Amino acid sequence: MNYNDPLEPAMIITKVLSKSDIVGNVVLPKAEVMSVLTRMNVNDQDLLNGVEVQVDDIMEDDLYTVTLKVSGIDKPKYYFGTGWSTMKHSLDLSEGDVLKLYWSHLDNKFVVLNFQYSVLPLMIPV
């Protein structure tokens, strides 16, 4: 992924985490996931069984493997199952936090966009 190129808004998934997302599996916004799925090489049957995807935290240099699944046919719900618990604890996520992921179709993985910006103090020589 070239981090100097602008991000495609259609490849971003944003979710404000609820208590149930923290206690169990995180349910992802349907419209945003469906937009990302246009670039992933998966079909409905793959998602029913679960597809392992990588999630890259480039700030901490951590790579997570989570299972992206769908439940239900009439009203599908997309969620991260296996691997989500490890990822949420490592990212120190809690209720009310915003999870923001970018699907990098060239790298075939999600990239965490939850950057914690910090400013180094200005050092003035005396």
Swiss-Prot record:
Signal peptide: none annotated. Its main location: nucleus. Residues 20-118 bind DNA. SMART domains: B3 (SM01019). It is found in: Nucleus. The keyword Ion transport does not apply. Keywords: DNA-binding, Nucleus, Transcription, Transcription regulation. The keyword DNA-binding applies. It comes from the Eukaryota. GO terms for cellular component: nucleus. One of its GO terms (molecular function) is DNA binding. InterPro entries: B3_DNA-bd, B3_domain, DNA-bd_pseudobarrel_sf. PANTHER family: TF-B3 DOMAIN-CONTAINING PROTEIN, TRANSCRIPTION FACTOR B3-DOMAIN FAMILY-RELATED. This is B3 domain-containing protein At5g54067. The lineage of its organism: Eukaryota, Viridiplantae, Streptophyta, Embryophyta, Tracheophyta.
